């Protein structure tokens, strides 16, 4: 079967996807090892029998809703190719807004930054790549996530990062940081969106929080006060309908200069504040 023939067949079978053509192209690139430009320019190239079998298996899994990132094992974030697995969240483009806001507020001089619930290490590695003069600490309570983040750091040859297992601040006693960032669980366990799309294949522990999705957010806001240098920043990603509640939690905890930033879809996505000791 030719590349172009397989693409047509795959696109027709993936109409339930938000991006059937791109999904099909990614799977073909993954199995053949060829780039998109080559595949489109040489569409008459023949697939081997082994490649056809691999593609059929992947196409079935994608048709059943399994995320493309899980099928290929890789997702790009901040132009960094990251290994992903079912043990962690798949990095989303909107989380790059958190990285942008963090970089805009970091002091010019070297400092220490903490990423809570690092997962793949996406946020921490993006900050470490952009600010090689800073020392990044990234923690996750799940050992599989810690191992994956360490693998990504090694693969990207990023040295200014320390990744360890910790239940939020449990292993960080006495340490202080100029900035703390986190994309914590913030979805209500009753949210119907948990039964839709990629999140069906992602760990609930990384998605769901008690108290209508606010429990971990409030915990981080309160506990970060002891881990920030005076005037340090806390930046949190949250759900698009949680902006007001998160701002109030910051204010009640004594933070200053509290504001919410919008994502690429113009939804409230990142709330931040400064804490003075």
Swiss-Prot record:
Entries under Pfam families matching the protein: MTS (PF05175), PrmC_N (PF17827)
Chain residues that bind substrate: 183-186
Keywords: Methyltransferase, S-adenosyl-L-methionine, Transferase
Annotated residues for binding of S-adenosyl-L-methionine: 117-121, 140, 168, 183
CDD domains: AdoMet_MTases
GO BP of this protein: methylation
Catalyses which reaction(s): L-glutaminyl-[peptide chain release factor] + S-adenosyl-L-methionine = N(5)-methyl-L-glutaminyl-[peptide chain release factor] + S-adenosyl-L-homocysteine + H(+)
Keyword Transferase among record annotations: yes
EC numbers on record: 2.1.1.297
Source organism, top-level taxon: Bacteria
SUPFAM superfamilies the record matches: S-adenosyl-L-methionine-dependent methyltransferases
Family affiliation: Belongs to the protein N5-glutamine methyltransferase family. PrmC subfamily.
PANTHER family for the chain: HEMK METHYLTRANSFERASE, MTRF1L RELEASE FACTOR GLUTAMINE METHYLTRANSFERASE
Physiological role: Methylates the class 1 translation termination release factors RF1/PrfA and RF2/PrfB on the glutamine residue of the universally conserved GGQ motif.
Protein name as catalogued: Release factor glutamine methyltransferase
Source organism: Shigella dysenteriae serotype 1 (strain Sd197)
Recorded name of the encoding gene: prmC
